[in-house]
Amino acid sequence: ALENVMLAKELLAKAQPDYKTRKKEIHNEIETEAKSLLEQMGLADRMNNYPHQLSGGQCQRVAIARALALKPDILCFDEPTSALDPELTGEVLKVIKGLADQETTMIIVTHEMAFARDVSSHVIFMDDGCILEQGTPSEVFEHPKEERTRQFLSRFTNG
């Protein structure tokens, strides 16, 4: 997991003009940051594991740490829990909620409606590739304007 989180950052570091003279120092900085990110993801005990030794939720959290290592302005998630069983889904959603609490800007495509309502500052409801409705979680979830939005949300509120 540690090497996975470090890889992209190390490849980028090799393009720095002073890389050859600061190689060890740069490597140590990247490693320290990667360890910190894995700890933040709850994976301190899995740093030396390979992907085949990790659960789906753990692999997803390694991927989040790898993305964070590059210090992006925006993190994009496309159904981050769709391939996970319910127990592992909670682990990943907890990490994403923590990022939201730190005011990390994220775009999340999800069918986890309760999660979207609780974590989002802005919600967009799309149908057939088109934006049908957007607004605050309260506006979209509690007072939807569009019939299609109401129809979709009724599946989650009426059982």
What are these regions (language model features)?
Residues A116-D118:
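A short, surface-exposed alpha-helical micro-motif characterized by mixed small hydrophobic
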Residues L75-D78:
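Catalytic Walker B motif of ABC-type/P-loop ATPase nucleotide-binding domains
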Residues T110-H111:
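H-loop/switch region of ABC-family ATPase nucleotide-binding domains
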Residues I64:
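Hydrophobic anchor residue at the start of the ABC signature
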Residues N49-H52, L70, Q102:
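Conserved signature/switch motifs of ABC ATPase nucleotide-binding domains
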Residues M6, E10-K14, D18-D45:
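Conserved ABC ATPase "signature" region
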